[in-house]
Amino acid sequence: MDQTATPLSGDVTPRPAAAAIAVAAIAVLIVSYGVNAMDRTLFPLMLTDVRREYGFDLSQGGLMSTIFTLGMTLAGIPTGYLMSRFSRKTVIQVGILIYSLATIITVTAIGFADMLFYRAITGIGEAMQLTALLAVFSSYFSRHRAAGVGLLNYAYAGGAAIGPTLGARLLDDYGTWRAPMIIYGVIGLAMMVLIAAVVRPQLSETNTAKQATTGIAAGGAASLKNLNTVVLVALSILFGLALYGYLGMYPTFLREELHYAPRDAGRVMGIYGLGVLISLFTGWLGDRFSPRLVLGLSFLLASAVAGLLFNGPADFTTQAALSFVLGATFSGTIFVNLAAYHVKSVTANLAGRASGLFVTCVYGSATAAGYVIGWIAGFAGWTVAGNIQLVLLCLAGAAIALMLRGDQMARQPKQGT
């Protein structure tokens, strides 16, 4: 056989080069989700300035802060279907384009109605990107799905840590909330171009349903209508209300109730993001231990921490430490494993639809989270609002998690090569 006669085709890449390209593509996708997180965490920090300029009350401000999740709700399940007709890479890029442009256009709003509309549109793009990324990482890391989602969640950690801190600095430097919004939108557009240049279909379009069965997770229900999915839907709804009650209005609580300066509030919210860095480890825990144990204990811990946040000391060190623990629990543990358990509850060919269902449930309930906690805070004070929307809902989640059946979820075959 003549080994010199046949040159490498465009589809044949030496293994070291292919590995380097894959690592670069994974890194770009991780950073792109970090930019998504930066965009999501920016507006709540700007809310005090927006309320001051436009005259919104607490409930209106709360709705404005979390209305983007309505867009995520509307886009979640349809995006799952879109991924069966278009490439995941394309869906990711279009999603980034939508939310970046909407973020920039928000600064042109003349009142409550049009700003609310622009903020909702950002959620459509963010949901498209998130749903496609969940499918990419769950499929590409099919042997360790929860750990794969945990790796993706490192992006959220970075974005959630950088976003509020950088946003507060830009707010101080430019003296207007509009400057950070425009700058973050431009960063998103740059990420869209980078993905086009770096991410290849061999990575983004991996489909475990088409692979050989050896080494692929076995089990899971053949339909979304199963006990585990129903329980996970309930948990996702409660989680969305609690998570975005915190993310949407906690910066306002810090600035208006505890009288924190913008930079201090941004630092506290950034420290929340650092708590998410344990997500790779907690994703591994989710692969190894019972979903009852992982989610039940996590919701219980979140309830205790939330109680201290809204009832305990108001000093910076205490609030920052508690926010770090809540970040590790909420976004670092519960989010990662809820997403993975949704996928593991069904067969591999339903991974995209399960991811879409997860996104829709979490962000559907989150749509009302800011309005509800803002209304309660305006009526009965921040302590009562935090106790109802975070403490009690997390306690309910801990109880409901006991209904999960880990033996009915997909699991990795013990033999391996």
Regions found by a protein language model. Name each.
Residues 151-199:
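Helix-loop-helix hairpin linking two adjacent transmembrane segments in secondary transporters
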Residues 43-44, 228-279:
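Extracytoplasmic gate region of multi-pass secondary transporters
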Residues 118-156:
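Cytoplasmic helix-loop-helix junction between adjacent transmembrane helices
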Residues 74-110:
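Conserved MFS/SLC helix-loop-helix module at the cytosolic interface between two early adjacent transmembrane helices
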Residues 343-382:
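A late C-terminal transmembrane helix in Major Facilitator Superfamily
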Residues 10-18, 202-231:
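Juxtamembrane intracellular "pre-TM" segments in multi-pass secondary transporters
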Residues 75-87, 279-290, 377:
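Helix-to-loop junctions at the C-terminal end of transmembrane segments
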Residues 290-338:
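C-terminal transmembrane helical hairpin of 12-TM major facilitator-type secondary transporters
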